[in-house]
């Protein structure tokens, strides 16, 4: 195993970009990170909440699913998505959403926050068929 990036709060959803960079979502940090071949990471976008899945769309943009965000605490040395009282659903929880993120500029466009009149309830991961 080789460590290729450090300083990411809770990385998920790695996406290999055409230029060789790897984009990950940082669930805990509410941000989208880009890591180059040298292991240098930088913030691409900060959608907030808990981004927890990404996919490269046919238009070259990143599509990111977001669970809405959760409180975090450390229990027995392990970071978990639960506050100190044991609650995993923060006050004001929105349920999550899907964003389109320009892979070059990091510009964020909110696309969906529900389906058929119902809000999302913590969506996780996203894929494209073609």
Identify the meaning behind each predicted range.
Residues 1-130:
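Sequence-structural signature of mature extracellular/luminal beta-sheet repeat domains
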């Amino acid at each position: 195993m080789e460590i290729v990036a450090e300083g990411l709060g809770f990385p998920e959803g790695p996406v290999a970009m055409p230029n060789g960079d790897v984009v990950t979502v940082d669930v805990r940090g509410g941000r989208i990170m880009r890591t180059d071949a040298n292991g240098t990471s930088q913030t691409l976008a900060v959608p907030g909440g808990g981004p927890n899945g990404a996919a490269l769309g046919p238009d070259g943009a990143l599509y990111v699913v977001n669970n809405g965000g959760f409180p975090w605490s450390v229990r027995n040395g392990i970071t978990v998505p639960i506050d100190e009282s044991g609650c995993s659903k923060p006050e004001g929880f929105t349920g999550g959403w899907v964003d389109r993120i320009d892979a070059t500029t990091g510009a964020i466009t909110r696309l969906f926050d529900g389906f058929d009149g119902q809000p999302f309830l913590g969506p996780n991961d996203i894929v494209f068929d073609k």
